[in-house]
């Protein structure tokens, strides 16, 4: 689950990680009150959306007077934000963050992330901040340092010394850096985060380290342990079908292809996406209905996939170990019989009650193409999608 910037800053502030004061406004009137609270005559106004690239796409405005700040609040609250990270979708802007300007001497990057290659949390630092870290890694690898954390000791003193030396922080700045890194790592573990990113982390002219922007992602599977974080979920920032899938308990991720997929098991679902791509097709979604979905859940899953107007072909790929193929067939038929315009459908059923499942579909009169092979089914679905 992603947090908005202001929510991320609230979390980091609770761990004594320093940053300039900030306030959130959802109207011009609130923006006016915010100016009085902050006591500023100039500042930065930023849209609060679950996407990066805000500065490059008009989502951040530097204002040099109270009038400019209020004008920026009004302008940003009426926009729908689009960047290369929104997959072409326009995200609504319901809040903006207002914060004072800072005299910056240097910008850095600091993050704690899950390193899937090494299967451990990793601290990532860079002497170049305020830019895309991917770009820095490619062009200036010598300006980036990564430190792997163990699940037991978590962070050693020699690692802290290595990081402070690499960043060139001396004296009080170095002491601040040590404490900030310790607190950030503690925050990462305490909240089951998969990403804590500060970009930029700045050193002021006075030598203080401050967080100017923060991004936090919490492991969805651990949210039951963090009720105070769970309530921060903002469905307005997600695809409508993603939100609906969560409500009905399905693992669904919207993609940008035109072949709708309904599969049981995450591994089989990933393999289905891969083989469609191998044969020149593109999936419209990832959907894992699980191993024990009921007929009602299958109906909801089929309806969910077909609600995507980009879906031109439906590919059902079920391996029925625990799953009952007849329940899948009944759920499919129940939905299809209510629709006027049927799209081409490819069905691969294997396992428990497979013959009964096929019979249910065939007797319904719904035009479906059956296959016993995943490879053949994928080829057929791709051909129908062209």
From Swiss-Prot:
What is the catalytic activity of this protein?
succinate + ATP + CoA = succinyl-CoA + ADP + phosphate; GTP + succinate + CoA = succinyl-CoA + GDP + phosphate
GO cellular component terms attached to this protein's record: cytosol; succinate-CoA ligase complex
Query: Can the keyword Transcription regulation be found in this entry's annotation?
Result: no
Which HAMAP family does the record associate with it? Succ_CoA_beta
Q: How does it assemble?
A: Heterotetramer of two alpha and two beta subunits.
Q: Which GO terms describe its molecular function?
A: ATP binding; magnesium ion binding; succinate-CoA ligase (ADP-forming) activity; succinate-CoA ligase (GDP-forming) activity
Q: List ligand-binding residues for Mg(2+).
A: 199, 213
Pathway of this protein? Answer: Carbohydrate metabolism; tricarboxylic acid cycle; succinate from succinyl-CoA (ligase route): step 1/1
What is the name listed in the Swiss-Prot or TrEMBL entry for this protein? Answer: Succinate--CoA ligase [ADP-forming] subunit beta
Enzyme Commission designation: 6.2.1.5
**Which UniProt keywords are present, listed alphabetically?**
ATP-binding, Ligase, Magnesium, Metal-binding, Nucleotide-binding, Tricarboxylic acid cycle
Free-text function comment from the UniProt entry = Succinyl-CoA synthetase functions in the citric acid cycle (TCA), coupling the hydrolysis of succinyl-CoA to the synthesis of either ATP or GTP and thus represents the only step of substrate-level phosphorylation in the TCA. The beta subunit provides nucleotide specificity of the enzyme and binds the substrate succinate, while the binding sites for coenzyme A and phosphate are found in the alpha subunit.
- Binding, substrate: 264, 321-323
Q: Which domain of life is it from?
A: Bacteria
Q: Which residues bind ATP?
A: 46, 53-55, 102, 107
Q: Name one GO biological process term.
A: succinyl-CoA metabolic process
């Amino acid at each position: 689950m992603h947090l908005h910037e202001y929510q991320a800053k609230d979390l980091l502030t609770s761990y004594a990680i320093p940053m300039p004061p900030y306030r959130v406004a959802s109207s011009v009137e609130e923006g006016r009150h915010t100016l009085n609270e902050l006591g500023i005559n100039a500042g930065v106004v930023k849209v609060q959306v679950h996407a990066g690239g805000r500065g490059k796409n008009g989502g951040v405005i530097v204002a040099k007077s109270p009038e400019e700040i209020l004008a920026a609040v009004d302008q940003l609250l009426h926009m729908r934000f689009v960047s290369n990270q929104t997959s072409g979708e326009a995200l609504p802007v319901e809040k903006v963050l207002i914060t004072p300007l800072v005299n910056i001497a240097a910008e850095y990057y600091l993050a704690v992330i899950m390193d899937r290659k090494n299967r451990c949390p990793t601290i990532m630092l860079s002497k170049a901040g305020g830019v895309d870290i991917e770009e820095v890694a490619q062009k200036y690898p010598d300006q980036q340092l990564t430190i792997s954390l163990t699940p037991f000791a978590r962070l050693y003193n020699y690692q802290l010394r290595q990081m402070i030396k690499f960043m060139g922080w001396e004296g009080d700045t170095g002491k601040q850096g040590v404490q900030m890194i310790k607190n950030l790592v503690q925050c990462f573990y305490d909240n089951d985060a998969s990403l804590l990113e500060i970009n930029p982390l700045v050193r002021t002219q006075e030598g203080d380290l401050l967080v100017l922007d923060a991004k936090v992602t919490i492991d969805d599977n651990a949210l039951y342990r963090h009720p105070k974080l769970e309530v921060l979920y903002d469905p307005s920032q997600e695809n409508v079908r993603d939100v609906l899938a969560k409500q009905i308990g399905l693992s669904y991720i919207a993609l940008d292809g035109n072949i709708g997929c309904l599969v049981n098991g995450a591994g089989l679902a990933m393999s289905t996406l891969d083989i469609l791509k191998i044969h020149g097709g593109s999936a419209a979604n990832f959907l894992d209905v699980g191993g024990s979905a009921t007929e009602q859940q299958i109906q909801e899953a089929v309806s969910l996939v077909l609600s995507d107007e980009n879906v031109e072909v439906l590919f059902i790929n079920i391996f029925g170990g625990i799953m009952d193929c007849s329940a899948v067939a009944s759920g499919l038929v129940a939905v299809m019989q209510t629709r006027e315009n049927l799209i081409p459908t490819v069905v691969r059923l294997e396992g428990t009650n497979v013959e009964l499942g096929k019979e249910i579909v065939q007797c319904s009169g719904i035009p479906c193409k059956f296959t016993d092979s995943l490879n053949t089914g994928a080829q057929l679905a791709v051909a129908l999608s062209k």
